[in-house]
Each structure stands twice: as C-alpha cells, then as structure tokens.
C-alpha cells in the first residue's frame, strides 16, 4: 500500500510540474544535461515562425483559380504525379482554373520520393514553360518538386548543387525572386505546404538531402481535408507515422535558445530552429490526435535513399520505395530510447499521451517506456518488423551511418549529440522491433 501511495504522489508531482510553464525559457530540463556552446560560438536567442499563408476548409480547393486570377497569373504550371492526375483533387483544380480563365500546362511526371534526376526533369519543364505561377497538387514529393522547379526556373544560370544543402551542395542563399506557388496537399504529415524545404534522394551518394530556404516556401497552402478521402489505407498510415515522429522530434528537440551558432543576420536563421513555446503546443496537440485517431520522418533519410527492392503496399510506383513516414517510424523506438536521458520528463509526457501508464514510472525509465509504447503502437498497426523486414541487414549499417552524417541540419537539433558509433548502434537496434 505504501509503495502505491508513493507512486501516486510521484505521479501527481510530475503532473504539477507539467502544469507549470514548460517553455524553454523557463524550463530547466536541459540545463544540467548540456554543456556550453562550442568555443567561439554563441547560442541563439530567438525563433521565427516563417511559414506560408494557410487556408483550411472542406472544398477550399475550388478557390485556387480565383487565387491565381487575383495574383495576375497568365501562364500556370500544374504539377502532380501520374496517379493523382487521374483522381478528383487534380480534376477539381483544373476545373477551377478553366472556370477562371487561367491558361495552364500539366506536368504529371513527379516521382514519389523524388531524386536529383527527377527534380532536374521538372526543372527543365519549368524553364521551357516560362510560367508566371505554379500549383502543386499532391503529397510532399509533388510540393518539393514544384518548389525546386520554381527556384531553378527563376535562377536559370545556377548549377543544381548551388542551392543544395552543404556539405553535399554549396548551400548558397537564394537571392532571386520566385514566382507564386500554391500548394494543394493531398496527404497529411509532410507539412511541405508550410516550409521552405525541398527533399530529394541524391543518387550519387545514395542519401536524402535537400534545399532549405524561406524563399522557396509556397505563397499559399490550400488545406482541403476532402482530399484525404482518396488516400489508400497504407498511405494514410504512413502519413500518420510522419505526424507521430515529427511531433515527437519537435517536442523533444534541443530548445531554440541552446542551438548554435546564433545567426549574424536574421535572414540566415535556419528552417529547423529547435523546440519553442509555439511549436510545443502544436506538437502535443498532434500527438493527442495521433493517439486518438491513428489506429482507427534524420535517420530516415539514408533508409529511404538506400532502399533496395522494397515496395510499400498501396504505392503505385515502378521503383523501390520506402515512404518517408515508414522510414522514420522504424527507427523511432531506438532513437527515443537514446535521446531520453537529456529530457526524460518530456519523453515520459509523450509516452503518457500515447497511452502509457506512467504513474509508477521512474525518470531513468523514460526512454524504454516511450520505446515500448511506440512498439505496441506499430505492432497494432501491422508495421514491418524493423529494417530487416524491408530488406536491410547489419552489412548495410556502415552505409546507413555514412548517409546520416551529412544530415546535420536535422541531427544537430537532437537533444543528445551522436557519434558514428552511436548511430551504428541505433541502426542495429532498429533491425528488429518486436
């Protein structure tokens, strides 16, 4: 009885602690765990919510033609993929463009999980078309491809690697004006309609990388929940895994005021800035939505980039494909076990949101508790049993680690720094989940 009482008291104390202000400025979760910023560098003191304008509503897609008319668009590029080009979301967009007298051309050769090669094909189409506006209808792959096409068509003399993130590319800042881009997402999870990020597989190195600049973010995102009704079951699940993992990553990330270096000019503040009071609210809300409804995305990048023969169910593609949401979630139990020691209270809180009973939990057990909660979640949703189930083996681990190392823009926001040995151990632990 005494043990149960003590456990109840500990649970109530944790709840009271969570009721207090948890923003990074007032929380000391990380203050004892992390040392000072690297020598010669200073940490940031601000964060910025640099996102696209968003319009939400069932049926809002039909307004796209009026939006383009209001922008003065005369020659529009409509980008999508082969599958979606035959489905209602694209037809609704085309009907709206025709109704409002907008001239347009369709590019429907977007590759699901794009590559540098597929980006360049879309870029050539955009350069030849001399478009004055773009509409992207699809998931993250379509929106990212359209961002890249808009960028390089607006900067036709640039080499492809000029704007690609360092160290793979040159990471040059975007200084040219881009054309308006309206994003019409048909999946939930990527959030590409709000960001200045375009992700692709760089085939030469077999890794995912991208372009990150606020200049390429869409002008407007039209969020129409009716489009999700056309998603196959497994696409719905993998999109949900994207939401789950990115919400966990956001909430447990290094706080914005501990990220270094501090930018010398606000224009160079990165897209990924760390946890902050605003994103914390949305991350927790997203986790609650996932916990309630789902059962009814750094380490994922090399997994997707090095895919061999695996083809995800419900994805009608002619190439091997590991969807981003799946590649993220397969490593999540190992990753959050690893990061928990730096912010155990937040890891326990997320485990509780996802259904774990944390009343008798000890702080040192935060990682294993969250990992077990995630495993049960994935098992109930019939997710593949780890990396081995989608074609990887221990022999692939060195290449997976090599593919993770260039992803500093993402991995440096993890609350716990990682060595190559740490990454290797995480991939090995992710070979089998159950």
Model regions and ranges:
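ATP/NTP phosphate-donor binding region
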Residues: 14-133, 387
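Generic secondary-structure signature for well-ordered alpha-helical cores
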Residues: 69, 98-103, 124-128, 151-154, ...
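C-terminal charged capping/lid subdomain of soluble metabolic enzymes
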Residues: 5-34, 347-434
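Active-site segments that bind and position negatively charged phosphate/pyrophosphate groups
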Residues: 255-373
């Amino acid at each position: 009885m005494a043990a149960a009482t003590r456990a109840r008291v500990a649970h109530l104390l944790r709840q009271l602690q969570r009721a207090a202000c948890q923003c990074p400025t007032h929380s000391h979760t990380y203050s004892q765990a992390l040392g000072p910023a690297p020598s010669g560098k200073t940490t940031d003191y601000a964060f910025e919510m640099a996102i696209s304008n968003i319009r939400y509503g069932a049926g809002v897609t039909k307004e796209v033609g009026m939006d383009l008319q209001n922008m003065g668009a005369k020659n529009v590029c409509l980008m999508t993929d082969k599958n979606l080009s035959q489905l209602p979301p694209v037809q609704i967009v085309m009907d709206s463009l025709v109704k409002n007298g907008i001239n347009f051309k369709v590019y429907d050769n977007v590759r699901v999980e794009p590559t540098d090669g597929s980006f360049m094909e879309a870029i050539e189409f955009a350069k030849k078309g001399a478009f004055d506006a773009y509409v992207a209808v699809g998931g993250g792959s379509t929106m990212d491809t359209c961002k890249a096409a808009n960028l390089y068509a607006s900067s036709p003399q640039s080499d492809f690697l000029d704007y690609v993130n360092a160290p793979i590319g040159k990471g040059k800042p975007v200084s040219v004006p881009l054309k308006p881009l309206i994003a019409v997402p048909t999946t939930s999870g990527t959030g590409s309609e709000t960001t200045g990020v375009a992700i692709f597989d760089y085939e030469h190195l077999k890794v995912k990388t991208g372009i990150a600049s606020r200049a390429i973010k869409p002008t407007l995102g039209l969020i129409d929940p009716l489009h999700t009704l056309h998603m196959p079951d497994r696409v719905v699940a993998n999109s949900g895994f994207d939401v789950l993992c990115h919400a966990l990553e956001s909430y447990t990330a290094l706080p914005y005021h501990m990220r270094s270096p501090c930018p010398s000019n606000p224009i160079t503040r990165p897209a990924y800035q760390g946890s902050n009071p605003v994103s914390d609210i949305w991350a927790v809300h997203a986790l609650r939505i996932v916990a309630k409804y789902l059962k009814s995305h750094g380490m994922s990048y090399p997994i997707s980039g090095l895919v061999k023969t695996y083809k995800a169910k419900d994805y009608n593609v002619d190439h091997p494909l590991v969807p981003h949401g799946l590649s993220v979630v397969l490593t999540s139990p190992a990753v959050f076990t690893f990061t928990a020691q730096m912010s155990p209270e937040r890891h326990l809180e997320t485990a509780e949101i996802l259904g774990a009973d944390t009343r008798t939990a000890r702080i040192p057990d935060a990682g294993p508790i969250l990992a077990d909660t995630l495993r049960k979640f994935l098992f109930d949703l019939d997710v593949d049993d780890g990396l081995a189930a989608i074609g990887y083996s221990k022999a692939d681990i060195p290449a997976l680690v090599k593919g993770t190392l260039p992803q500093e823009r993402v991995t440096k926001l993890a609350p716990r720094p990682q060595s190559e040995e740490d990454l290797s151990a995480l991939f090995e632990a992710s070979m089998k989940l159950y």
